[in-house]
């Protein structure tokens, strides 16, 4: 399963009560799907699943607003 699909599946399981999918560029923050506590849950998942480490500086909306941004963040961290 690719990175985007794993992130998508986690988001559906954890944050979507009545939805079955998100589009890659749907803004999860502005739509209220994920909030600051949700970002912390997401970060924990990303660190465990993809064996990455995040810093306080990483915790900005630009890294977590959409599935595409989350995937890009993970790929950047994995390449670092």
Where are these regions (language model features)?
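Residue-level recognition of oxygen-bearing side chains
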Residues: 6, 27, 69
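Phosphopantetheine carrier-protein modules
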Residues: 14-33, 52-60, 78
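Conserved catalytic core of two-component sensor histidine kinases
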Residues: 40
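AMP-binding/adenylate-forming catalytic domain of the ANL superfamily
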Residues: 58-69
